[in-house]
Amino acid sequence: MKTLSEIKEILRKHKKILKEKYKVKSIAIFGSYAREEQKETSDIDILIDYYEPISLLKLIELENYLSDLLGIKVDLITKNSIHNPYVKKSIEEDLIYI
């Protein structure tokens, strides 16, 4: 099981690729990994914002890329997809930007 520090380092090293290939403007970790309460079975929750909208297929490709890169299942959401104010507040409380 990777630590939060290891995950942050991997994501930092790949920021350029994420920006160029997937148009990622910002990337942040939230949820159990951000709170350092993860278990062996935990996935990693990642929030992205992008420079220009990407297609659903590209979003799925990015989620798979990140899962392979980190060796952990990634649950990826976009900043613009959070419409419920309570969910948004809960996510914002955990966010760790890379």
Swiss-Prot record:
TM annotation in the entry: none
Motif GSX(10)DXD motif per record, residues: 31-45
InterPro entries in UniProt: NT_sf (IPR043519), Polymerase_NTP_transf_dom (IPR002934), Type-VII_TA_antitoxin (IPR052038)
Cofactor note: Binds 2 Mg(2+) ions.
Cofactor needs: Mg(2+)
MF-aspect GO terms: ATP binding; metal ion binding; nucleotidyltransferase activity
Keywords: ATP-binding, Magnesium, Metal-binding, Nucleotide-binding, Nucleotidyltransferase, Toxin-antitoxin system, Transferase
UniProt-annotated binding residues for Mg(2+) 1: 43, 45, 75
Record's catalysed reaction(s): L-tyrosyl-[protein] + ATP = O-(5'-adenylyl)-L-tyrosyl-[protein] + diphosphate; O-(5'-adenylyl)-L-tyrosyl-[protein] + ATP = O-[5'-(adenylyl-(5'->3')-adenylyl)]-L-tyrosyl-[protein] + diphosphate
Residues at which Mg(2+) 2 binds: 43, 45
E.C. number: 2.7.7.108
Role description: Probable antitoxin component of a putative type VII toxin-antitoxin (TA) system. Neutralizes cognate toxic MJ1216 by di-AMPylation.
Subunit structure: Probably forms a complex with cognate toxin MJ1216.
Similarity field: Belongs to the MntA antitoxin family.
Protein name (record): Putative protein adenylyltransferase MJ1217
